[in-house]
Amino acid sequence: MATVGMNDVKNGMKILVNNEPAVITETEYVKPGKGQAFTRMKYRFIKSGRVVEMTMKATDDVEVADVVDTDMRYLYSDGEYWHFMDPETFEQVQTDKAGMGGADKWLKGEEDCIVTLWNGTPIWVQPPNFVELKITETDPGVRGDTSGGGGKPATLETGAVVRVPLFVNQDEIIKVDTRSGEYSARVK
């Protein structure tokens, strides 16, 4: 495996920590007036989402993870596995709920996603930034009922629940930001 020195470590780089892939979220190079320089970094394990902070000497090395981000199209779910296809090679891969990373609540079929593969196996799925989904259940908005912030919960066709404005009704299609899980707009 390839290794890089602490001087070459950057945010967004994918590394191996205890044989598990992680992505670096923050790095800070510190050169104290007295003593040896060191790098303080935060990284998030891709599979579990756990965030860890670590301090390493400037002379230490980290192992680069052999992970690949691939554009793939979500096809379907058979209840236990979610199936994806590479639109160029038509190669198909499947992942379980752990590999979905919470993206399953935003996907209904035929969406383009970024799938992170580690040793050929999907370990993380990043859905599109915005998805258009139909509201299957929500309470009718009562005029003047804005004391609680002017929102109400709505269940979408995939089972996800988001807060929507009072003017949005059942059977309407809305645009949702998958990064925050918030309502973005009503689709006409």
Curated annotation (Swiss-Prot):
Keywords annotated in UniProt: Cytoplasm, Elongation factor, Hydroxylation, Protein biosynthesis
Chief place of localization: cytoplasm
Cited PROSITE patterns: EFP
UniProt GO MF annotations: translation elongation factor activity
Keyword Protein biosynthesis: yes
Pathway terms, separated by semicolons: Protein biosynthesis; polypeptide chain elongation
A GO BP annotation: peptide biosynthetic process
CDD domains (UniProt xref): S1_EF-P_repeat_1, S1_EF-P_repeat_2
GO CC, one annotated term: cytoplasm
Subcellular location: Cytoplasm
Disulphide bonds in the chain: none
Gene3D superfamilies: 2.30.30.30, Nucleic acid-binding proteins
Modifications after synthesis and translation: May be beta-lysylated on the epsilon-amino group of Lys-34 by the combined action of EpmA and EpmB, and then hydroxylated on the C5 position of the same residue by EpmC (if this protein is present). Lysylation is critical for the stimulatory effect of EF-P on peptide-bond formation. The lysylation moiety may extend toward the peptidyltransferase center and stabilize the terminal 3-CCA end of the tRNA. Hydroxylation of the C5 position on Lys-34 may allow additional potential stabilizing hydrogen-bond interactions with the P-tRNA.
Highest taxon listed in the record's lineage: Bacteria
Positions bearing N6-(3,6-diaminohexanoyl)-5-hydroxylysine: 34
Job of this protein: Involved in peptide bond synthesis. Alleviates ribosome stalling that occurs when 3 or more consecutive Pro residues or the sequence PPG is present in a protein, possibly by augmenting the peptidyl transferase activity of the ribosome. Modification of Lys-34 is required for alleviation.
HAMAP family: EF_P
Family as reported in the entry's similarity comment: Belongs to the elongation factor P family.
Name used for this protein in its record: Elongation factor P
